[in-house]
Protein backbone atom coordinates (compact mmCIF):
# COMPACT_ATOMS: atom_id res chain seq x y z
CA UNK A 1 0.00 0.00 0.00
CA UNK A 2 1.30 3.45 -0.93
CA UNK A 3 1.83 5.96 1.84
CA UNK A 4 3.36 9.35 2.53
CA UNK A 5 3.33 12.50 0.43
CA UNK A 6 5.37 14.00 -2.39
CA UNK A 7 7.05 17.35 -1.77
CA UNK A 8 8.72 19.61 -4.31
CA UNK A 9 10.95 22.26 -2.76
CA UNK A 10 9.12 21.62 0.50
CA UNK A 11 5.61 22.05 -0.93
CA UNK A 12 3.03 19.29 -1.42
CA UNK A 13 2.25 18.45 -5.04
CA UNK A 14 -1.24 17.03 -4.52
CA UNK A 15 -4.01 19.51 -5.30
CA UNK A 16 -1.47 22.31 -5.74
CA UNK A 17 -1.61 23.82 -9.28
CA UNK A 18 1.10 26.35 -8.51
CA UNK A 19 3.64 23.62 -7.71
CA UNK A 20 2.53 21.57 -10.73
CA UNK A 21 3.40 24.49 -13.01
CA UNK A 22 7.03 23.71 -12.14
CA UNK A 23 6.72 20.05 -13.17
CA UNK A 24 6.55 18.39 -16.58
CA UNK A 25 6.15 14.62 -16.86
CA UNK A 26 7.65 13.22 -20.05
CA UNK A 27 6.17 9.73 -20.37
CA UNK A 28 7.59 6.83 -22.38
CA UNK A 29 4.16 6.75 -24.08
CA UNK A 30 3.11 10.42 -24.27
CA UNK A 31 -0.62 11.16 -24.19
CA UNK A 32 -2.20 13.23 -26.94
CA UNK A 33 -5.76 13.78 -28.15
CA UNK A 34 -6.85 11.35 -30.87
CA UNK A 35 -6.71 13.83 -33.75
CA UNK A 36 -4.23 16.23 -32.19
CA UNK A 37 -1.48 17.95 -34.13
CA UNK A 38 1.70 19.31 -32.59
CA UNK A 39 0.08 22.74 -32.80
CA UNK A 40 -2.96 21.46 -30.86
CA UNK A 41 -0.77 20.02 -28.09
CA UNK A 42 1.29 23.20 -27.95
CA UNK A 43 -1.89 25.22 -27.31
CA UNK A 44 -2.93 22.68 -24.66
CA UNK A 45 0.37 23.05 -22.79
CA UNK A 46 0.32 26.83 -23.17
CA UNK A 47 -2.86 26.81 -21.07
CA UNK A 48 -1.17 24.68 -18.40
CA UNK A 49 2.15 26.51 -18.39
CA UNK A 50 1.85 30.32 -18.70
CA UNK A 51 5.63 30.54 -19.08
CA UNK A 52 5.58 28.46 -22.32
CA UNK A 53 8.32 29.56 -24.75
CA UNK A 54 6.63 30.13 -28.12
CA UNK A 55 9.79 31.35 -29.87
CA UNK A 56 11.76 28.38 -28.60
CA UNK A 57 9.04 26.03 -29.80
CA UNK A 58 9.12 27.42 -33.35
CA UNK A 59 12.91 27.24 -33.45
CA UNK A 60 13.02 23.61 -32.24
CA UNK A 61 10.36 22.23 -34.58
CA UNK A 62 12.36 23.72 -37.46
CA UNK A 63 15.55 22.22 -36.07
CA UNK A 64 13.94 18.77 -35.78
CA UNK A 65 12.04 19.19 -39.07
CA UNK A 66 8.63 18.45 -37.52
CA UNK A 67 5.35 19.51 -39.13
CA UNK A 68 3.24 21.16 -36.43
CA UNK A 69 0.05 20.76 -38.51
CA UNK A 70 0.41 17.02 -39.06
CA UNK A 71 -1.53 14.65 -36.80
CA UNK A 72 0.71 13.20 -34.12
CA UNK A 73 -0.76 9.71 -34.51
CA UNK A 74 0.89 9.57 -37.95
CA UNK A 75 4.33 10.25 -36.43
CA UNK A 76 6.86 7.47 -35.92
CA UNK A 77 7.76 6.56 -32.34
CA UNK A 78 10.96 8.57 -32.58
CA UNK A 79 9.15 11.62 -33.99
CA UNK A 80 6.55 11.47 -31.21
CA UNK A 81 9.36 11.38 -28.66
CA UNK A 82 11.05 14.37 -30.27
CA UNK A 83 7.77 16.30 -30.35
CA UNK A 84 7.09 15.84 -26.64
CA UNK A 85 10.70 16.58 -25.68
CA UNK A 86 10.25 19.91 -27.45
CA UNK A 87 6.98 20.53 -25.57
CA UNK A 88 8.67 19.60 -22.28
CA UNK A 89 11.59 21.98 -22.78
CA UNK A 90 9.41 24.84 -24.02
CA UNK A 91 7.06 24.53 -21.05
CA UNK A 92 9.92 26.13 -19.09
CA UNK A 93 9.37 24.14 -15.92
CA UNK A 94 11.92 23.87 -13.14
CA UNK A 95 11.74 20.07 -13.18
CA UNK A 96 11.26 17.61 -16.05
CA UNK A 97 10.49 14.03 -15.03
CA UNK A 98 11.56 11.71 -17.84
CA UNK A 99 10.57 8.07 -18.30
CA UNK A 100 12.79 6.18 -20.80
CA UNK A 101 13.34 9.45 -22.63
CA UNK A 102 15.85 8.10 -25.17
CA UNK A 103 13.86 5.01 -26.09
CA UNK A 104 12.99 5.02 -29.79
CA UNK A 105 15.57 7.62 -30.77
CA UNK A 106 18.38 6.82 -33.19
CA UNK A 107 21.93 7.61 -31.95
CA UNK A 108 22.18 10.90 -33.84
CA UNK A 109 18.87 12.27 -32.54
CA UNK A 110 19.71 10.97 -29.07
CA UNK A 111 22.90 13.05 -29.08
CA UNK A 112 21.00 16.11 -30.34
CA UNK A 113 18.47 15.72 -27.51
CA UNK A 114 21.24 15.40 -24.90
CA UNK A 115 22.94 18.51 -26.26
CA UNK A 116 19.59 20.29 -26.18
CA UNK A 117 19.03 19.38 -22.53
CA UNK A 118 22.60 20.42 -21.65
CA UNK A 119 22.13 23.76 -23.37
CA UNK A 120 18.85 24.34 -21.56
CA UNK A 121 20.45 23.55 -18.19
CA UNK A 122 23.15 26.13 -18.85
CA UNK A 123 20.61 28.80 -19.79
CA UNK A 124 18.30 28.41 -16.80
CA UNK A 125 17.83 26.56 -13.53
CA UNK A 126 16.34 23.24 -14.56
CA UNK A 127 16.62 19.72 -13.16
CA UNK A 128 16.09 16.52 -15.14
CA UNK A 129 15.00 13.40 -13.29
CA UNK A 130 15.34 10.37 -15.56
CA UNK A 131 14.09 6.81 -15.12
CA UNK A 132 15.80 4.39 -17.48
CA UNK A 133 16.82 0.77 -17.95
CA UNK A 134 19.38 1.76 -20.60
CA UNK A 135 22.18 2.89 -18.33
CA UNK A 136 24.60 3.46 -21.20
CA UNK A 137 22.45 6.35 -22.41
CA UNK A 138 22.84 8.10 -19.04
CA UNK A 139 26.54 7.46 -18.55
CA UNK A 140 27.85 10.72 -20.00
CA UNK A 141 24.80 12.74 -19.07
CA UNK A 142 23.67 12.44 -15.44
CA UNK A 143 25.33 13.89 -12.34
CA UNK A 144 23.72 11.56 -9.80
CA UNK A 145 22.33 8.03 -9.82
CA UNK A 146 19.70 6.30 -7.70
CA UNK A 147 18.80 2.62 -7.74
CA UNK A 148 15.17 1.75 -6.97
CA UNK A 149 13.95 -1.81 -6.41
CA UNK A 150 10.42 -2.79 -5.34
CA UNK A 151 9.64 0.76 -4.25
CA UNK A 152 12.76 1.20 -2.12
CA UNK A 153 15.73 3.44 -2.85
CA UNK A 154 18.60 0.99 -2.48
CA UNK A 155 21.43 3.34 -3.35
CA UNK A 156 22.04 6.94 -4.35
CA UNK A 157 25.17 9.00 -4.91
CA UNK A 158 26.96 11.31 -7.32
CA UNK A 159 28.38 9.48 -10.33
CA UNK A 160 31.64 11.41 -10.02
CA UNK A 161 32.05 10.15 -6.44
CA UNK A 162 31.24 6.58 -7.49
CA UNK A 163 33.86 6.56 -10.22
CA UNK A 164 36.49 8.14 -7.95
CA UNK A 165 35.90 5.66 -5.12
CA UNK A 166 35.45 2.46 -7.16
CA UNK A 167 38.09 1.12 -9.55
CA UNK A 168 38.21 -1.66 -12.11
CA UNK A 169 41.66 -3.24 -12.23
CA UNK A 170 43.11 -5.94 -14.43
CA UNK A 171 46.29 -7.77 -13.43
CA UNK A 172 48.42 -10.76 -14.34
CA UNK A 173 50.15 -12.61 -11.49
CA UNK A 174 52.61 -15.48 -11.68
CA UNK A 175 50.59 -17.33 -9.01
CA UNK A 176 47.21 -17.16 -7.30
CA UNK A 177 47.10 -14.05 -5.06
CA UNK A 178 43.35 -13.99 -4.37
CA UNK A 179 43.65 -14.63 -0.62
CA UNK A 180 46.14 -11.79 -0.18
CA UNK A 181 44.09 -9.39 -2.29
CA UNK A 182 40.84 -10.14 -0.47
CA UNK A 183 42.54 -9.70 2.89
CA UNK A 184 44.03 -6.30 2.12
CA UNK A 185 41.59 -4.75 -0.35
CA UNK A 186 37.88 -3.94 -0.32
CA UNK A 187 37.00 -6.12 -3.30
CA UNK A 188 33.47 -5.74 -4.65
CA UNK A 189 33.80 -8.13 -7.61
CA UNK A 190 36.53 -10.62 -8.45
CA UNK A 191 37.08 -12.80 -11.49
CA UNK A 192 40.03 -14.93 -12.56
CA UNK A 193 40.90 -16.75 -15.77
CA UNK A 194 44.22 -18.52 -15.41
CA UNK A 195 46.63 -15.88 -14.16
CA UNK A 196 44.50 -13.02 -15.51
CA UNK A 197 42.54 -11.23 -12.77
CA UNK A 198 39.78 -8.65 -13.16
CA UNK A 199 38.43 -7.01 -10.01
CA UNK A 200 36.43 -4.01 -8.88
CA UNK A 201 37.85 -2.47 -5.72
CA UNK A 202 36.62 0.32 -3.45
CA UNK A 203 39.01 2.78 -1.89
CA UNK A 204 41.78 5.23 -2.74
CA UNK A 205 43.34 4.35 -6.08
CA UNK A 206 46.95 5.04 -5.07
CA UNK A 207 46.71 2.91 -1.91
CA UNK A 208 45.09 0.06 -3.86
CA UNK A 209 47.80 0.04 -6.51
CA UNK A 210 50.56 0.14 -3.89
CA UNK A 211 49.12 -2.93 -2.20
CA UNK A 212 48.83 -4.79 -5.51
CA UNK A 213 52.45 -3.93 -6.36
CA UNK A 214 53.58 -5.75 -3.22
CA UNK A 215 52.91 -8.98 -5.13
CA UNK A 216 54.86 -7.76 -8.17
CA UNK A 217 52.29 -8.38 -10.90
CA UNK A 218 53.58 -9.14 -14.39
CA UNK A 219 51.11 -6.55 -15.68
CA UNK A 220 48.52 -4.29 -14.05
CA UNK A 221 46.31 -1.40 -15.14
CA UNK A 222 43.07 0.36 -14.27
CA UNK A 223 40.31 0.62 -16.88
CA UNK A 224 37.20 2.83 -16.96
CA UNK A 225 34.25 1.58 -14.94
CA UNK A 226 30.91 1.86 -16.74
CA UNK A 227 27.72 2.98 -15.02
CA UNK A 228 26.30 -0.51 -15.67
CA UNK A 229 29.16 -2.06 -13.71
CA UNK A 230 28.61 0.41 -10.88
CA UNK A 231 24.92 -0.57 -10.89
CA UNK A 232 25.71 -4.31 -10.74
CA UNK A 233 28.28 -3.86 -7.98
CA UNK A 234 25.86 -1.86 -5.84
CA UNK A 235 23.02 -4.32 -6.43
CA UNK A 236 25.23 -7.24 -5.41
CA UNK A 237 26.13 -5.27 -2.31
CA UNK A 238 22.50 -5.32 -1.15
CA UNK A 239 22.04 -9.04 -1.95
CA UNK A 240 19.95 -8.33 -5.04
CA UNK A 241 19.24 -11.62 -6.83
CA UNK A 242 19.85 -10.60 -10.45
CA UNK A 243 19.08 -14.14 -11.67
CA UNK A 244 15.40 -13.52 -10.90
CA UNK A 245 15.48 -10.60 -13.34
CA UNK A 246 17.52 -12.24 -16.10
CA UNK A 247 15.83 -15.63 -16.01
Could you describe each region identified by the protein language model?
Residues 2-5, 150:
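Conserved coupling/switch loops of ABC nucleotide-binding domains, chiefly the family-specific signature
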Residues 4-19:
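Conserved ABC transporter NBD signature motif
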Residues 27-83:
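ABC-family P-loop ATPase nucleotide-binding domains
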Residues 96-100:
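Catalytic Walker B motif of ABC-type/P-loop ATPase nucleotide-binding domains
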Residues 107-109:
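Helix N-cap at the start of a conserved alpha-helix in ABC-type nucleotide-binding domains
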Residues 113-203:
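ABC transporter nucleotide-binding domain
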Residues 200-247:
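C-terminal coupling/interaction segments
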Amino acid sequence: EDAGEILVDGDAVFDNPQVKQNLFYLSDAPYYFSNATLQTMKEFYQNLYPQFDQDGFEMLIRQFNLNENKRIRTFSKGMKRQAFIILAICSNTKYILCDEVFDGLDPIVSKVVKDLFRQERKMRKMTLVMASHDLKELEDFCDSIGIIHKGDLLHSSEIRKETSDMHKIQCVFEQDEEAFLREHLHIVRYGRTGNFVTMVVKGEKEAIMQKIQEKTPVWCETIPLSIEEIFLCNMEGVDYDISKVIF
